[in-house]
Amino acid sequence: MSDEVQPGFVRVRLDLSYDGTEFSGWAKQAAGRRTVQGEIEDALRTVTRSGETTYELTVAGRTDAGVHARGQVAHVDLPGELWAEHQEKLLKRLAGRLPKDVRVWSLTEAPSGFNARFSAIWRRYAYRVTDNTGGVDPLLRSHVLWHDWPLDVDAMNEAARRLVGEHDFAAYCKKREGATTIRTLQELSLVRGDDGVITATVCADAFCHNMVRSLIGALLFVGDGHRGPDWPGKVLAVGVRDSAVHVVRPHGLTLEEVGYPADELLAARNKEARNKRTLPAAGCC
């Protein structure tokens, strides 16, 4: 994937939100499954009268089926003439064409070197769970997990602090051949709101598959007393998947925001993000 925009094209940044309940994830799939990418690309093709031509989106975070996004970012390269013709009315036309569970909030010409995926320096997710004896507020049922054991948020935060930093998160990721599982977890913290809903904030430079939901699964085991606060850190250190770590359900997870560097740093960030990371050797640094 090149960061160079082809001659005659304009790179456009999209800021968008969606309720993931009825989607089979972000990425287009076979067999006609409904996806966020598919809906937006279809709408874009229709409102720009592009016939059979599909302009493919690149996204900051490829969310799984059932996962929501409040602050997702994508980009698309459009022919300059098409962008000039439709720019002023494109946002409103998309609003009229897109289904109600996905919205595009802004369309802007991206700065040189911008790549929605590789330019990002952090992604921030929130996972919401309640241990309310009566269950989840019906109005929040598609966005909050119900855990039927009382949760000790202080114990969960104690466990979370031991996971922050640069580590190999292989124990919390679904393995992909040739892909690194080294990530820098910048924040992992939990707060109980006045309504009893516990919000876990999870921020990292990037995430591997199932990482956020696996981390939350481990912390829930600590919170309900089935494991001690040191257990998630021990699992991390072993470096292999532990069958006791559950991948929690997707509907409690929302991509809240994606961060990018200043425009002049985009090219360097793109190059850095493509490098396969390794941890320092033992005794080094």
Curated annotation (Swiss-Prot):
Listed InterPro entries: PsdUridine_synth_cat_dom_sf, PsdUridine_synth_TruA, PsdUridine_synth_TruA_a/b_dom, PsdUridine_synth_TruA_C, TruA/RsuA/RluB/E/F_N
Catalytic residues as annotated in Swiss-Prot or TrEMBL: D64
Ranges annotated as spanning the membrane: none
Keyword Oxidoreductase listed: no
Enzyme class, first EC level, given as a word: isomerase
Disulfide bond residue pairs: none
Binding of substrate, residues: Y125
Catalytic activity line of the entry: uridine(38/39/40) in tRNA = pseudouridine(38/39/40) in tRNA
Pfam family, one: PseudoU_synth_1
Cell inner membrane in keyword set: no
Domain of life: Bacteria
Task performed by this protein: Formation of pseudouridine at positions 38, 39 and 40 in the anticodon stem and loop of transfer RNAs.
Subunit note: Homodimer.
UniProt protein name: tRNA pseudouridine synthase A
Organism: Streptomyces avermitilis (strain ATCC 31267 / DSM 46492 / JCM 5070 / NBRC 14893 / NCIMB 12804 / NRRL 8165 / MA-4680)
Gene expressing this chain: truA
